[in-house]
Amino acid sequence: DNTLTLALRQVANLSAGKVLTGGSLALAVPVLKNNGLLQVGGDLTLTGDSLDNSGDISARTLTLHHSGAQTHNAGAKLQAQLEAVLSAATLTNNGSVLADRLSLTSDTLVNGGQLQGTKQLDITTTTAGNSGKLLTDGALTVKASSLNNGGTLQGEAINLTGDSADNS
C-alpha cells in the first residue's frame, strides 16, 4: 500500500512549496492553506475544518471534506483524472475545478469560477449562487432550495430541483 497518512494541526504549503507523491495521500488537518503544488499520483483525501486554496491540487481521485469553509481562490486549480467529491458547509470557488465526475455538497455554494465534470456534474446545496460556469458534456444536476444563476449552466441534460430559481 503506497499511502501516506498525516494528521497535523495546521499546514501551510506556500507558493514555492511542493508536496509530491506517486502513491496516495490522506491528510487530516484542521486548517490547510495551499498556495503551492499538491500533486498525488493516486487518491488524495483532505479532511478538516477549512481549506484555503490558491495553488494547484491534482490527483487520480480527490475527496475533500471540510466542516467549515472550503475556498478555491482566483487562479487556483483543482483537478482529478477520475472523480472529485467536495463537501463543506460553505464552498466558494473562484478558480477552476475539473474532474471526469464532479460531485459537490454544501450548505452554501458560491461559484465565480469554473466547475466542470467532463462526464457528470452533481451539486447538492441549500443555497447556490453561480456567476461563473457549471459545465459538463453529460448530465448536470443541481439540487438547491435556492438557485441564483447569473452565469453559465451547460450540459447534455440539465436537471434543476429546488424551491426557487433566478436565472438573470
Predicted regions mapped to residue ranges:
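Residue-level signal for pocket-adjacent positions within structured domains
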Residues: 27, 46, 92, 129, ...
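Low-complexity/repetitive intrinsically disordered segments
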Residues: 1-8, 161-168
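Short, T/G/N/S-enriched strand-turn elements that build extracellular solenoid repeat scaffolds
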Residues: 14-20, 32-39, 51-58, 72-79, ...
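Short "repeat-start/strand-capping" segments in structured domains, especially the N-termini
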Residues: 1-4, 21-25, 40-45, 58-63, ...
